[in-house]
Amino acid sequence: MTDSGIRIIKHYDFNEEDFNDPICILGMPGIADIGKFAIDSLIGQLDAKNLMDFIFDDYPAGAIVDDSLLSAPKAEILFWKDPEQKRDIFLITADAQSLTPKGIYRISNFLSEIIFQCKVKLIIALGAYPVNSRKIDSKIPKIYVSSTDRDLLQKFLARTNCNKIQKGVIIGANGLIPTLAKARFNLDGIVLLAETDNIAMVNEDITDLKASITLLEMLKKSFTLPIKKKYSLDNIEDITKNLQNKRDQLEKDLNTFQFVDTEDKRKSLYI
């Protein structure tokens, strides 16, 4: 275990030279789990392999039960090797966010170091942008973008229909990891946030599959990702119900509510 309370479990031994011009896409649990579902979907579509897990002593103090098997809450890095050897992809997600601001800094700082060691040149973080429901286009959610580099931001805006995030705070690891990676290692980062109903900020049971899919489509177009699976508006409701059932079971297993009081929860609206 490291001095920061993080235990590393490696599944592959690798050298930095094993990966070709890699990028990193991350999505941690947050509002409506928009970023996390997008990453989970990418993991399945790319058949990504697990590189390493991280067990952290600031994650919820409970065990996850899946098919009668116990596991600890964790963050994980997976990888996909481009068969054309042009650009490999690292994917990062987690079962939970840290319970304290200090914990979020510790895990974000640690993951930014791992990303740097993997010779990543670009970090793409995915999350939610809560807005009043009356302002949401019912067909396609808008995507808002910010970046650690102004030139990168302008180039991205020029070739997409995304909106700039003028001001605000991106709370949680989705915003902190690319920010720390830029400050410490001069790695470029982009944060893409799909708009969702702001009721999700006070109702943790809400998921927004449409927003997650919109992020996936943007990734596919902007970064030429090999995403083949198509979702239709007709089956979104069924998929959302299945996703919600899994989320409810995970929350029940973790039983986090007894460890976080109402005031702390109000301060921790992770995007």
What role is predicted for each listed range?
Residues M1-R106, F110-C118, N132-I271:
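Accessory terminal and edge-of-domain segments that mediate assembly/interaction
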